[in-house]
Amino acid sequence: MFKELYKDSIVKSLKDKFNYGNIMQVPKLVKVCINMGVGDAATDSKAINEPLDSLYLIAGQKPLSTFAKKSISGFKIRKGATVGCKVTLRRDKMYEFLERLIYIALPREKDFRGFSVKQFDGNGNFSFGIKEHISFLEIDYDKISKIRGMDINIITSAVSDKEAKELLLALKFPFFD
């Protein structure tokens, strides 16, 4: 649905709004990166299995484990230890995930009022976090041992934050300012 919405109406409206000479100049979604930090995995090697399974269910794609670049004694992390997992979504899976995120997960999120414009990075990319991964319907609350958060980065081809915000507003992203 999001892909058709983008192709049918958003491209035309953004082209007119920003006076692009060509539809290839219109900003589009490039990829969505989802990251889940798992601090428990530094001491318990089996602690990463549950977040990997959860991220697989949420994204529909096999996630990769992420490893510590250097040792940090304060966090009891050694270089090369597993510290999280990530997945990068593109094309159809990206649009399916964003649709489930906006219409299902975000309304179920506690104390969610919308996104801020300050969450843009200055280059047209948008980043935010979710406190509870159980907001997604794919996760069975009875089968998980710990509620975890996740970071979501939306990378666009937009040159400025203004263009990226208009693209995300057209895709029904809830902004409060």
From Swiss-Prot:
Any GO MF annotation of the entry: rRNA binding
Tagged with keyword Ribonucleoprotein: yes
A GO cellular-component term linked to this record: ribonucleoprotein complex
Pfam family for this entry, one: Ribosomal_L5_C
Xref: InterPro entries: Ribosomal_uL5, Ribosomal_uL5_bac-type, Ribosomal_uL5_C, Ribosomal_uL5_CS, Ribosomal_uL5_dom_sf, Ribosomal_uL5_N
Keywords for the protein's UniProt record, in alphabetical order: Ribonucleoprotein, Ribosomal protein, RNA-binding, rRNA-binding, tRNA-binding
GO biological process, one term: translation
Presence of keyword Flavoprotein: no
Subunit structure: Part of the 50S ribosomal subunit; part of the 5S rRNA/L5/L18/L25 subcomplex. Contacts the 5S rRNA and the P site tRNA. Forms a bridge to the 30S subunit in the 70S ribosome.
Function: This is one of the proteins that bind and probably mediate the attachment of the 5S RNA into the large ribosomal subunit, where it forms part of the central protuberance. In the 70S ribosome it contacts protein S13 of the 30S subunit (bridge B1b), connecting the 2 subunits; this bridge is implicated in subunit movement. Contacts the P site tRNA; the 5S rRNA and some of its associated proteins might help stabilize positioning of ribosome-bound tRNAs.
Family, per entry: Belongs to the universal ribosomal protein uL5 family.
Name the record gives this protein: Large ribosomal subunit protein uL5
Organism encoding this protein: Wolbachia sp. subsp. Drosophila simulans (strain wRi)
Gene behind the chain: rplE
